[in-house]
Amino acid sequence: MIVCPFKDLGRYAPVLPGLEEAVKVAEGLTDLTPRTIPLSDGNRIMIVAGTSRSPVNALSEAHRNYLDLQYIVKGEETVGWAPLDTLEVAEEYNAEKDISMHAGPVEFVRIPAGHCYVVYPEDGHMPGVQLDEPHDFVKLVVKLKV
């Protein structure tokens, strides 16, 4: 897992194919209406608006074919993280949706506006949660093929 200010994300372009294009598109966005923006090579950016939720009874997710880059544009969220091999499978892998769901303890990291995180296939992650009170957020979820 990588956590950093969005402005510093470009340094990871050599090890994240498709990142340079995604950052350029993200930097040019002025309309944050929820939608999906296709990128080259099957990559995409999803603009998501929501309110953080309680982590109680929440499951972590994992992906095999795409990594998640989640950039908090407005508001904040907390993400839970754990090595995938420490979590128990709660819902088997769905190849069509590229997702499996997992149960188990996670560590929490607060992600403020202007920051982002990247999770790889070996990272279980619980996005969009709160540890105190609900927070509204707008974020870009970038899916990059691995």
Task: Describe each PLM feature range.
Residues 65, 101-106:
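Short alpha-helix capping/helix-loop boundary micro-motifs
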